[in-house]
Amino acid sequence: LALGLVAFPFAVRADDAQQNMVMEHGSQVMPFDESQAMHMFLPSATGGVVEIVVHDMNPTQIALVRAHLLQEAAKFARGDYSDPAYIHGKTMPGLVQLASGSSRMSVHYFETPSGAAITLVSTDQPLITAIHEWLAAQERDHKSGQMNHCDMQM
């Protein structure tokens, strides 16, 4: 019991340190104002979706979100996950598998009325599991509260 009490504060500090790193590194990679947008990480039976929605329909922020996700989708299709690695850390769950499995999945960019999204789709079950792990890690780091709110079918 005493060990649990000692370990918990360290876990909270590690989480805080991770949050701080994500905020600092995210602002260096993402050109839009994160306080004006919400990240959503939505798993599906065949992969998942990363969606960024601008809160107040600000056209400048929407354009910045779209430019960012268009660029990220092109990188992901090539197996380049350097931006998520920089933002979340190189040990991010699922990251290595996604980078090495780019030939076994399709990556699609699409615009939404208030932002944009990227879909990651595969028929390879281990890769789908890696996508889910990667989405869950982003959900934890961004604390968006959107994981599993929608189980999209692709």
Model regions and ranges:
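Bacterial N-terminal signal peptides
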Residues: 1-7
